[in-house]
Amino acid sequence: MEVLRQMLVHKANNSSMSTHKGLNRTEPVRMTYDHCELLGQLSTLNFSAASNTFSSGYNTTIKGSAPKTIQTVSSLFSKDITKAMSDIGNLVARMFPTASAERAAVILDITVFGFIADDLLEDAALSSDSEAFDKLHMLMLRLVRNDSFSEDEYPEYQNLIRFTRPIFTKFQALASRTLLNRFAYTYQEYLQGVQWEASLQPNQIPDFETCKNVKRHVGAWLCYFVLAEFAREIEVPITVRGNLEVQKFVTLACDIASYDNDTFLLKKEIRDGVVSNTIVITYLHGAKRLQDALDRILEMRKQTESEILAITSNLPHFGKDDKVAREYINALTCVIGGNFEWCSKTTRYQDPK
């Protein structure tokens, strides 16, 4: 990609980049971060170039389970946490259109848990207390793995435990042990990405590739891709998941979903001072205007979409596993297509009144 090549050249020429001896990594670039300047450009942004090729569908069974889940959340958590949950049923309905009513309900609950966990982790007081932050991380992993532990260890999170325990007990009952372990592993990777994102400072901007690689995990897309198998009641063998073309497809699908979230969250994240948005990073690494940075990311998304379509048109044959491989690819395209449709329409990402 020409845009990416230019970014990497810019990074290589930036004298403020420093490499630790013996370590294959670079420190974030220290550069001026003018929050007011970014805020001033929000009103002129044009998102009309955002488009999506991947279709999904709509799972009508979610309509029955979503209100009950939202009601339970409202009874256990603050209004600040629950205010953005009203539309979450539409996200799951679009990403997992073929899931049975029973499995769709579990996926909905897991997704709600993920949103609640995100809100808890974003608490400013928690992020400044590393011990408390790590404690919450450990609790979340224990809940996702459905481990046995004394709830007395977490008096401040009784409502989170009360809400989450039944979800992963049900998930464990329906999913294979392998699928459960894979989900727990991807969720642990996701939490590490969240921790990295929380460590960023406005005057320490990571390079574009580092940010993109981490955001493949921060967006929890690998978790959703495991849930896509669960929704279709399939388990993709390692011979398929380990195939280089399939691995490339998964990576590109993560990138597209991250680009979409960054696009539709852009205004909110700029207001919140978030610097890990790839559009913001593109702007801070040399784009003259925020609109230029947005257009670059949308162009990269378009090219990534073309690469995905090329892979799906030329998938290798997997013998007896060929049917499940193709269903897996179809399931992942539903996830990214449904995410785009939801992000572009949900009130969660609209301008505040």
From Swiss-Prot:
EC number in record: 4.2.3.-
Pfam families the UniProt entry points to: Terpene_syn_C_2
Binding site for Mg(2+) 1: D118
Highest taxon of the lineage: Eukaryota
Site label Plays a critical role in the stabilization of intermediate cation, positions: F115
Name this protein carries in UniProt: Terpene synthase 3
UniProtKB keywords: Lyase, Magnesium, Metal-binding
UniProt signal peptide: none
Keyword Glycoprotein found: no
Enzyme class: lyase
Comment on protein domains: The 2 conserved active-site motifs D(D/E)XX(D/E) and NSE are required for coordinating the divalent metal ions that stabilize the PPi moiety of the substrate. The C-terminal WxxxxxRY motif is frequently found in terpene synthases and is important to guide product formation.
Chain sites annotated for binding Mg(2+) 2: D118
Keyword hit for Translocase: no
Function statement: Terpene synthase that may be involved in the production of volatile terpenoids. Does not show detectable terpene products with either farnesyl diphosphate (FPP) or geranyl diphosphate (GPP). P.polycephalum has a unique biology and these volatile terpenoids could function in internal communication of P.polycephalum, to mark the territory that have been explored, or they may be involved in chemotaxis.
UniProt short sequence motif WxxxxxRY motif, positions renumbered to this chain: 342-349
D(D/E)XX(D/E) motif (motif): residue ranges: 118-122
GO molecular function, one term: terpene synthase activity
Binding site residues for Mg(2+) 3: N261, E269
Motif NSE motif in this chain: 261-269
Necessary cofactors: Mg(2+)
